[in-house]
A protein has these predicted regions:
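Charged low-complexity stretches with an acidic bias
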Residues: 74-84
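Oligomerization/assembly interface segments of phage tail-like spikes and tubes
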Residues: 62-76, 109-119
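Acidic-leaning, charged glycine-interspersed low-complexity segments
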Residues: 83-123
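Short, low-complexity, polar/charged sequence segments that are solvent-exposed and flexible
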Residues: 49-52, 63-67, 88-92, 118
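Residue-level signal for secondary-structure boundary sites
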Residues: 52-54, 78, 121-123
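Small/polar-rich, solvent-exposed N-terminal microdomains that initiate assembly or binding
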Residues: 1-51, 55-56
Length: 123
């Protein structure tokens, strides 16, 4: 199973997180890459932004470092509870928060968080 699939399954399975997000016909507002309908908030968008070798031996990649980025989009900037719930999910997957930033767009407030983990190649 890919890292993106594992992240989606864990985020979507989190009832505390899903209760805080907009519901649509597909379920709670969790999307990979981008949101198909940016008019309904709050939503969470995730993507794998980096997957690089971290350890190699005898020309074989033994471990890699993966970075997943979460965007929390809200109309009112109240994303603290969503952030806490998402961090708990990412921590349970072995990811650790690397950096975060806040943006104000024309129609939404955005909280961006990057999470990193190391993983064996065979996983």
């Amino acid at each position: 199973m890919s890292i993106a699939s594992k992240v989606y399954q864990a985020l979507a399975a989190s009832k505390p997180l899903c209760r805080l997000l907009h519901k649509d016909r597909r379920g709670c507002g969790i999307y990979h890459g981008r949101s198909p309908d940016a008019g309904s908030y709050p939503i969470l968008v995730y993507s794998v932004i980096s997957d690089v070798p971290a350890l190699s031996a005898d020309g074989c990649e033994m471990e890699r470092r993966v970075t997943v980025r979460l965007h929390i989009l809200t109309k009112d900037g109240a994303y603290e509870r969503i952030e806490d719930a998402a961090r708990k999910v990412m921590d349970s997957l072995g990811f650790r928060r690397y950096q975060s930033m806040e943006l104000a767009e024309k129609h939404a407030f955005v909280k961006i968080m990057d999470f990193k983990t190391g993983t064996g190649v065979e996983e």
